[in-house]
């Protein structure tokens, strides 16, 4: 559920990517759309 630079900046266990400008905040989903969810506990969790 957290962003981890050790895994390429991906959010662990929720299938989205972290934005570089918000490494612990907003994520992008797999289709490239910006999601307004915080990394921990997203819909993808």
Swiss-Prot record:
An annotated GO cellular component? extracellular region
Q: Where in the cell is it found?
A: Secreted
The free-text tissue note of the record is: Expressed by the venom duct.
Q: Where does the record locate the signal sequence feature?
A: none
Cysteine disulfide links: 3-16, 11-28, 18-33, 27-39
Q: Which positions does the record annotate as the modified residue 4-hydroxyproline?
A: 23, 40
| One term of GO molecular function | toxin activity
Keyword terms of this UniProt record: Bromination, Disulfide bond, Hydroxylation, Ion channel impairing toxin, Neurotoxin, Secreted, Toxin
Which chain positions lie within coiled-coil regions? none
According to the UniProt record, list the residues that bear 6'-bromotryptophan: 17, 38
As for what it does, the entry says: Mu-conotoxins block voltage-gated sodium channels. This toxin reversibly blocks voltage-gated sodium channel in cephalopods, with no alteration in the voltage dependence of sodium conductance or on the kinetics of inactivation.
How does the record comment on the protein's domains? The cysteine framework is XII (C-C-C-C-CC-C-C).
- Identify this protein by name: Mu-conotoxin-like Cal 12.1.2e
Organism in which the protein naturally occurs: Californiconus californicus
């Amino acid at each position: 559920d957290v962003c981890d630079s050790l895994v390429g900046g991906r959010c662990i266990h929720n299938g989205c990517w972290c934005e570089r400008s918000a490494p612990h905040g907003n994520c992008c989903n797999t289709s490239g759309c910006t999601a307004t969810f915080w990394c921990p506990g997203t819909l993808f969790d």
